[in-house]
């Protein structure tokens, strides 16, 4: 099995594509589109288009190299029972739930399964063989089969893309760290919820304490046929 060398911060990371997964976190209309939840809650989504294109590029490279592709969709049932009631901290901290309480006309529209907000953006489409998982909280490891599905495939290295870097991406990468997964985030294939310093703080946390940081060009270079041929 071939291993590739990915240039990253704070140091390069070596992994076998067949034992690695590209994780696409919450690339839904809610997080990346005008009129979606983040936009309606007052977060800037005006610069997500390049992120979408970079994720498309990363997905294509990962698929060609034989990596597993995992797509997450964050949200709940249309009655929001899965979101938790007042006894859950999620009820009090979820900006989607708070926005709907402020604007009752949005109830049943934000992050509700089956709705436009919940759907992946049109530019990104899972293919047969990809893993598509719903998740009810920020971390993709919480109340999902992600861990068991990865272990069944002998996957130990996770490459992260998606929105939001400082919330669901970082939360999932951190939980993976605690479960002994090696996590690397492609910084130009992610976008923060909040001001730019939130992106920089999340990337600092990841490269300093929990994982590695790279970018889409370096990722594609590492997975290119020429690179794979050199190490075959």
UniProtKB/Swiss-Prot annotation:
The UniProt family comment states: Belongs to the isochorismatase family. RutB subfamily.
What job does this protein perform? Hydrolyzes ureidoacrylate to form aminoacrylate and carbamate. The carbamate hydrolyzes spontaneously, thereby releasing one of the nitrogen atoms of the pyrimidine ring as ammonia and one of its carbon atoms as CO2.
GO terms for biological process? nitrogen utilization; uracil catabolic process
**The keyword Glycoprotein is assigned to this record:** no
Organism, by scientific name, is Cronobacter turicensis (strain DSM 18703 / CCUG 55852 / LMG 23827 / z3032)
Which protein are we looking at?
Answer: Ureidoacrylate amidohydrolase RutB
Q: Does the keyword Hydrolase apply?
A: yes
Q: Which HAMAP family match?
A: RutB (MF_00830)
Give the NCBIfam families listed for this entry: RutB (TIGR03614)
Catalytic center at which residues? 26 (proton acceptor), 135, 168 (nucleophile)
First-level EC class: hydrolase
Family annotation (Gene3D superfamilies): Isochorismatase-like
